[in-house]
Amino acid sequence: MIIENSKVYNLDEVENLFFRPAFCGKAAEDMGIRVLYNMPLPTKIPLFSHNNDLLKPFTSGWQGGAAKSLEQKEIPMVKLKAESSYSAEDYFSTIYEIITNSSEVSLGDLSGTDLEKAETELFRRSLAESIYTNTWFGDEDGLLSNVSCMTGFLRQFITSKEDEDSITLLVHQEEQELPVSDIFKSAWTNANDELRALASEGNLVFFVNTRIYDAYHFYLESLGLIDMNGSGVNGRPTLNYHGIPIIEIPANGLRLNYAKDFCVLTDRRNLVLALNTTDSPEKEIRMWYNPDEMENRQRVVFLIGAAIVDPMLLSGHIYNQGVSLI
């Protein structure tokens, strides 16, 4: 099976078919972070200073003081491309599986539209997974992992602690041994007042790796605090600590050189992923068949960046050599 007619997607199709379904709305909420899409370049996050003393005795004239200062943090953007290729035989088996899993497709009449939808779904899955991996585990220096297209959140956590020691995020160089419940407890109790005060807004979240997530799951199960029939989907329950959601960050088989276990408490609005598909001259998403190599090929070019808005709103633990959970 080959892509007989190459397909180049226009701007609206790029947004509506590839990026918005994977990184906007419910999808962004599930990721637990803030996503900015197609913001003007350079991409900046406005940070307004706060004035908690707004009320004044009434008199004529203006008593509001000077205008509030506007601070902006720029998100460094990098241009990336994602490419994949399949032999005609492999491409057929992959696409055919996607098609047959759809109840709306008549296998006796596979139209071009059905095939195109399947091709789009295949590429979108791969693209979303690759962006997710780079967003969390990327390191341009290549020290954390072999994913080096951009510097992701985990590497930025460690760099922020190195730059500002007063951040209540502890980076442990040696292997630790402690109960999993103590990890969450200390992340909360050690958090500064500014971070704890944000709990009332409902946006605090714990980001943990799969190993800590599983250990906490089994810990709650041993206490009889998890209803395995009603609180999870496919064996993955929705966990929380004192009402704060716990989001699992799987490495998807990626081997990390350090930061092998982590538990980070922050506000979900504090971690920003910026995506831009409009302001790069080489922007494109296309699919085509290469007759010389007999391959179906797919490519996307876009801009991406990840940033921590306020490193002081971080708390928790990063274990470079892992943690022995008891």
Predicted regions: what they are:
Residues 2-53, 150-182, 213-326:
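Sequence/fold signature of self-assembling virion shell proteins
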Residues 17-100:
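Assembly/oligomerization interface modules of large self-assembling protein complexes
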Residues 55, 59, 107-110, 266, ...:
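Extended, non-catalytic structural segments that build the interaction scaffolds
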Residues 94-95, 132, 215-217:
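Short helix/loop capping segments that flank catalytic or ligand/cofactor-binding pockets
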Residues 96, 135-141, 200-209:
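Short coil/turn segments at secondary-structure boundaries
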Residues 103-190, 325-326:
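Alpha-helical scaffold segments that mediate packing/assembly in large oligomeric complexes
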Residues 183-219:
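C-terminal interaction module
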